[in-house]
C-alpha cells in the first residue's frame, strides 16, 4: 500500500470538509459497494460524520467484531438505533457509526478517522477505488475537485 497517496487523500479530504457549508453533504464510497463515510455540514453546530454500519451493508460485506472494534478504536461512536425506528430519541444518534463534531471542527482529524475507516475497515486498497457524491439539502450537486476523486455517476 502506498501510504503517500492515502496521506494526500487525507489532506485533500480535510480541505474539502472545510469547504462544506451548512446543509451540504459529502459521501465517499468504494465504487460498486455500499461501504461509505459521509459528512453533513451543520454550520455553527459543527459537522456530523457517519460510517456505514451493518444496517446498510449486504450480507457478504457485513462487519465482523474485529471491524466493529477497529471503528471504535478509530474514534467512531457505535450505532444507537435501527434505521426504521421512529419516535423521540436523543439528538445525535444514528443507525450508522457516527461522530458529531462541534465547531470549530478539526477537519484534518476527521479526515484521518474517515480515511482510516475506508482503508482499515472497509478494505479500500487505492484511492482510485473511491468515488464521491456531494449535494445540498435542495439536491443541487456540488463538485469537490480538490479531492482528486471521480464523482459518482448519478
What are these regions (language model features)?
Residues 2-3, 7-11, 15-40, 50-51, ...:
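Extracellular, modular beta-sheet/disulfide-rich ectodomains of secreted and cell-surface proteins
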Residues 1-6, 10, 89-154:
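Acidic, proline/glycine-rich low-complexity IDRs
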Amino acid at each position: 500500500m502506498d501510504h503517500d497517496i492515502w496521506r494526500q487523500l487525507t489532506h485533500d479530504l480535510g480541505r474539502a470538509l472545510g469547504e462544506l457549508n451548512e446543509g451540504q453533504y459529502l459521501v465517499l464510497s468504494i465504487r460498486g459497494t455500499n461501504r461509505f463515510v459521509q459528512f453533513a455540514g451543520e454550520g455553527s453546530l459543527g459537522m456530523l460524520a457517519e460510517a456505514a454500519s451493518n444496517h446498510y451493508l449486504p450480507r457478504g460485506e457485513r462487519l465482523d467484531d474485529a471491524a466493529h472494534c477497529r471503528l471504535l478504536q478509530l474514534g467512531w461512536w457505535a450505532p444507537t438505533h435501527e434505521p426504521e425506528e421512529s419516535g423521540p430519541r436523543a439528538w445525535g444518534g444514528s443507525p450508522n457509526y457516527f461522530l458529531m463534531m462541534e465547531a470549530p471542527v478539526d477537519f484534518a482529524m476527521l479526515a484521518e478517522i474517515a480515511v482510516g475507516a475506508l482503508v482499515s475497515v472497509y478494505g479500500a486498497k487505492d484511492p482510485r477505488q473511491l468515488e464521491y457524491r456531494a449535494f445540498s439539502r435542495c439536491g443541487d450537486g456540488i463538485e469537490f475537485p480538490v479531492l482528486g476523486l471521480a464523482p459518482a455517476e448519478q
